[in-house]
Structure formats: structure tokens, C-alpha cells
A protein has these predicted regions:
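A generic secondary-structure signal for well-formed alpha-helical elements
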Residues: 1, 39-42, 70-75, 88-92, ...
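Histidine-centered active-site microenvironments of extracellular/periplasmic hydrolases
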Residues: 2-59, 79-80
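Polar, surface-exposed loop/tail segments
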Residues: 4-6, 51-119, 194-203
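Structural recognition of the beta-strand scaffold that forms the well-ordered cores
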Residues: 8-10, 34-36, 100-102, 123-126, ...
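Short, solvent-exposed loop/turn and secondary-structure capping segments
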Residues: 19-24, 46-47, 69, 136-137, ...
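C-terminal, low-complexity/hydrophilic appendages and adjacent surface loops
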Residues: 27, 107-190, 196-197
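Long, internal low-complexity/basic segments
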Residues: 31, 157-172, 188-388
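Short glycine/proline-rich turn/loop motifs
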Residues: 42-49, 179-185, 255-261
Length: 388
């Protein structure tokens, strides 16, 4: 009789296995099936008819409060998500729930920083580091023949513009009509007819990540050192500081000449993470920021924070501006943790993705052995790629 007394949730944790699905914020990676089995005796807890299909948007964060509501337990104040089933849930309250938040940070050794907001048929995507190409090497993905063939065809110049998007810089923001464009290849962010929708969804996403607040505007090594014990308290204590970092990150949404002065101030700030984000914004603008090269070169030479200096390297190498490459070796030698090493190696791997012919003059011995003594260590995966 256990089957008649059990509500079962059946769902996946990500989209499909083909390239550009799992590990990306496209709908092919985010949208998954959710099937709920409800026995006859518990159907009164479900706001929908058994055997029916609902278009209600359900996020992962909704599952915990839903389980509590089904069990008749009050959902704690402050818990993320909204119950979509339970005695307290009315169909009229959730049948029009059509908003979903998505994100991408690190997948194994591959870093990016992407946030998405889906509202009905429209989806807004915010690429905070748009120079991070989707094709950035990731060990397990490139074991798949489809990834390998796609990369080979790109390098041979055999892809059309749509097929090539995967290997090229993204725009800082994008807007898609999912009903008409389910594969998210037709960006509407520059369409005059969609500016009202774009600005509204941009604002909604901005307010959401500020209110959370979104901890990922600090680099992961810093979070592990300062926030891992109690990330909620850390976030609330640093809410204003995070909002200031988000404001700097958002400078790449404006024309460069209107924000150059603010970028300069960020690069000069005493807060290293403001300098960090100022450099990321420079890389987003590319050679439009060439007037800041002397300031960026000074940061590379004199900044006390390794992760700030590597962002200076990133700008210079993305724009093929010469500097002493021995600095790379110094930065790697000065890494204080495996996580910091992996983040630095992500930048170096990105450069190799853009410039496959480039060679680097360091070896695995630059790091402690325990960082790369197992084949699946993230640092080892990056080093295997860079050394091969």
C-alpha cells in the first residue's frame, strides 16, 4: 500500500546531453520535465486535476516549500521559493505563475557568470562576462564527438553565422521570444519594438540579484574564505557592497563614452573587487577601452591582489596588447588555493580558446602536487588542456 500513500516527484537536474544544453542557460539546459504522481487519497492537496498538464512555471527552489506545504508544515519565513501544491495552495494563485530565474557560475573547471529571467514567452539573458565564449574548454564536454566536430568545423570556417555563435563573444544582454525562437538564436535586444520589454526585464533581474543578494559578484576563492560558514549572514552583511559591484558590472550596458569616467574610478578604488569588476567591464568593451591601457598595465605590475592582476592580463591578452608573459608564471606561483588557481587557469584557457596557437611556459610543477595528482582534479584538467 506504500504506492497509494506516497506522492512522487520525478524530474531531471538539467537539460539534454547534446552540446549547448546541459551546463548552459539556454532553455535546452534549464527547462526540464516535472511529473508528480498523486494517489487518489491525496488528490485534495493538489490544485490541479489528476492526469492534467499545467503551464505553471516551477523552479527548483519551489520544491522544498512545496514538500512542506504537502506535509502541512508552515513554510519558514525567509525560505526561497513558493509552494505549488498543498492544502494552502489555490489554483487561482499559481496557474499564472510564469516567472523563472536562471543562473550559471562554475561547471567543473569552466567559469562564467550568466543570469536569466523568464517571464512568459520572453527570456532576458545577462552575460556579465560576455567575452567568455560558450565553447570554452570543459574536460568532460569535449570527450563528446559532437563537441569535437563542432569545434573542428568552426576552425575550418565551415559554419554559418548562427552555428558560429557558440565560439564567439556574446552580447552583454539578450532578449528572446521563446515561443518563436526556442533555440535562442535571434536576439531582440536591439529591436526598437522590444525596448520596453527589454528595459522592464533588465530592471526586474537587476532588482532580484540585488535583493538576494547575489554572492557571485565576489570571486569564488574569496567566498570560500569569507562566506562559506554562513553565506546568508555574509550576504546580508555585504548587501550594500554587492550592490556597488553590480553597479560597476552594469556599466557594460551603456555606451562606452558615457561610462569611461566611472570605469576609471573603479580601477582606482581601494576595494580590490571594484578594481576586479572594472577590469571585467574593460574586457567587455574591448579596444573601446584602449585609453585605459596605461592604468591597466599599472594594475598588472603593482596590484597586491592576484585575482585583480589576472583580470588585467585577461584584458591585455584578449586585445593582443603585449606585456611580459613571465607575469603569468608569477601569478600562478603566488596562488594561495586550488580554487584561485582554477579561476586563473580559466582565463588562460579562454585565451587559448581565442588563440589556439599560443604556448605557455609553465608546467604542472608550478603548483603543489595535491592540486593535480588525481586525473579529475579541476586544476589537473586545465593543465592537461593547456600543456597538450
Amino acid at each position: 500500500g506504500l504506492m497509494e500513500d506516497t506522492i512522487i516527484f520525478y524530474y531531471g537536474d538539467h537539460g539534454g546531453v547534446l552540446p549547448r544544453s546541459k551546463g548552459y542557460t539556454y532553455e535546452s539546459g534549464l527547462q526540464i520535465p516535472l511529473v508528480v504522481y498523486v494517489p487518489e487519497k491525496w488528490k485534495h492537496l493538489i490544485p490541479f486535476d489528476r492526469g492534467s498538464r499545467s503551464q505553471t512555471f516551477v523552479e527548483f527552489i519551489d520544491l522544498a516549500p512545496t514538500a512542506l506545504a504537502l506535509a502541512g508544515v508552515n513554510v519558514p519565513t525567509g525560505m526561497d521559493g513558493t509552494p505549488v501544491m498543498g492544502k494552502i495552495v489555490q489554483k487561482s494563485e499559481i496557474q499564472n505563475k510564469n516567472t523563472a530565474f536562471g543562473y550559471a557560475d562554475r561547471f567543473d573547471e569552466k567559469y562564467d557568470l550568466v543570469r536569466t529571467l523568464r517571464v512568459g514567452k520572453y527570456k532576458y539573458t545577462r552575460n556579465y562576462q560576455p567575452f567568455n565564449i560558450d565553447a570554452l574548454f570543459n574536460f568532460y564536454r569535449y570527450k563528446m564527438l559532437a563537441y569535437k566536430e563542432w569545434l573542428s568545423l568552426y576552425r575550418e570556417g565551415k559554419l554559418n553565422d548562427v552555428q558560429s555563435q557558440f565560439f564567439e563573444p556574446k552580447s552583454p544582454e539578450a532578449l528572446y521570444n521563446i515561443d518563436q525562437d526556442p533555440h535562442e538564436i535571434n536576439d531582440l535586444s536591439n529591436s526598437e519594438n522590444h525596448q520596453e520589454i527589454l528595459l522592464r526585464m533588465r530592471g526586474q533581474l537587476h532588482e532580484r540579484i540585488k535583493e538576494m543578494p547575489d554572492l557571485s559578484f565576489y570571486p569564488e576563492p574569496y567566498l570560500l574564505d569569507n562566506a562559506i560558514v554562513n553565506p546568508t549572514t555574509f550576504g546580508q552583511n555585504n548587501k550594500t557592497a554587492i550592490a556597488e559591484l553590480i553597479a560597476i558590472a552594469d556599466l557594460n550596458l551603456a555606451p562606452y563614452d558615457l561610462v569611461e569616467g566611472k570605469i576609471k574610478l573603479a580601477l582606482q578604488d581601494k576595494n580590490p573587487w571594484k578594481r576586479y569588476w572594472g577590469l571585467i567591464v574593460c574586457s567587455s568593451f574591448g579596444m573601446q577601452a584602449k585609453g585605459l591601457v596605461p592604468q591597466i598595465q599599472k594594475i598588472l605590475q603593482t596590484d597586491e591582489v592576484n585575482l585583480v592582476r589576472i583580470r588585467a592580463v585577461e584584458f591585455l591578452m584578449l586585445n593582443k596588447i603585449s606585456f611580459d608573459k613571465n607575469i603569468l608564471k608569477i601569478l600562478l606561483e603566488n596562488t594561495s588555493s586550488e580554487t584561485e588557481a582554477n579561476l586563473i587557469l580559466n582565463t588562460i584557457s579562454l585565451i587559448k580558446g581565442y588563440q589556439p596557437e599560443i604556448k605557455f611556459n609553465f608546467s604542472k610543477e608550478i603548483f603543489p602536487g595535491e592540486w593535480h595528482d588525481e586525473p579529475n582534479d579541476l586544476v589537473n584538467r586545465r593543465l592537461e588542456y593547456l600543456m597538450n
